[in-house]
Amino acid sequence: MLQLRSLDLPIDPLAANANLDTMIDGRYYSQIYRRVMWLLQDESFGLGLDRRTPAGSFRMLCLFIIHCETLEQALRRAAEFINYCRTLTDAPSSYRRPVERLSDGTALYRFPENTDLVGASDINSASTTIAQTMAIWRRFCQWLIGKPLDLIAVHLQADAPARLGYFEQLFGCEVHFGSEHNAFLLAEYCLDCPLIHTEESLQKFLRNAPYHLLVSQEDDDSSL
């Protein structure tokens, strides 16, 4: 409790009369998140993933890709980093071919399989968790290239849930369930977008994380 009160928030969520439904600024939420992440030593963004993400992993991933020239290079290098990290556990990753340019001017960006993200018994019930993981990664890609990453469609392995509208609002495009892969379908030229950031701007981004990964942009109605 002392850890939370030391953040000097505009409200005290631990007070007896606190209204837990009160909206707070995303930057205050980010402060709370960073403190909880430090206490738990887990950077999984509170998504309920099957495995803990050790503190510092996201920073190392960012440093690993920040000097890539294009988004495609960054996506491929990020997959290498994720695969390497998973070899340190007892669960080898099936995340082997992240980017595929198709013959019709589009491309697929594949995410890890459902069983790499959540427990085998939770695959269909965790469709929201998987979708939010993908949405956060999309926002990170948008930060890397400095502009929106427009999607043609999103593919999810999980069966269709009852709340289809939530997923369409989250991504702003068609969402297909029961697919072979968890993937983004996007225009091929998006892969050639240059990365615009440096290690200096990355450090500022990390100081404010996860703010830019959770809060919608002005023209985006897909807040998590």
Regions found by a protein language model. Give the residues of each.
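Short hinge/gating elements
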Residues: 59-65, 116-123, 192, 211
